[in-house]
Amino acid sequence: DCCPCPAGAVRCRFACC
């Protein structure tokens, strides 16, 4: 699963979709 990543979002465990 991916975490929600808007432009310039904070880094997440998984790659952004």
Swiss-Prot record:
The keyword Manganese does not apply. Keywords: Amidation, Disulfide bond, Hydroxylation, Neurotoxin, Secreted, Toxin. Transmembrane segments: none annotated. Expressed by the venom duct. The modification 4-hydroxyproline is found at residues 4, 6. The modification Cysteine amide is found at residue 17. Disulfide bonds join 2-12, 3-17, 5-16. It is found in: Secreted. One of its GO terms (cellular component) is extracellular region. One of its GO terms (molecular function) is toxin activity. The keyword Endoplasmic reticulum does not apply. Elicits excitatory activity in two subsets of the mouse dorsal root ganglion neurons; the medium diameter isolectin B4-expressing neurons and the small diameter CGRP-expressing neurons. Displays low inhibition of the human alpha-9-alpha-10 nAChR (IC(50)=10.2 uM). In vivo, intracranial injection into mice causes strong tremors and impaired locomotion for around 3 hours after administration. The cysteine framework is III (CC-C-C-CC). This peptide has a cysteine scaffold similar to the M superfamily of conotoxins, but it displays a disulfide pattern previously unknown in native cone snail peptides. This is Turripeptide ubi3a. It comes from Unedogemmula bisaya (Sea snail).
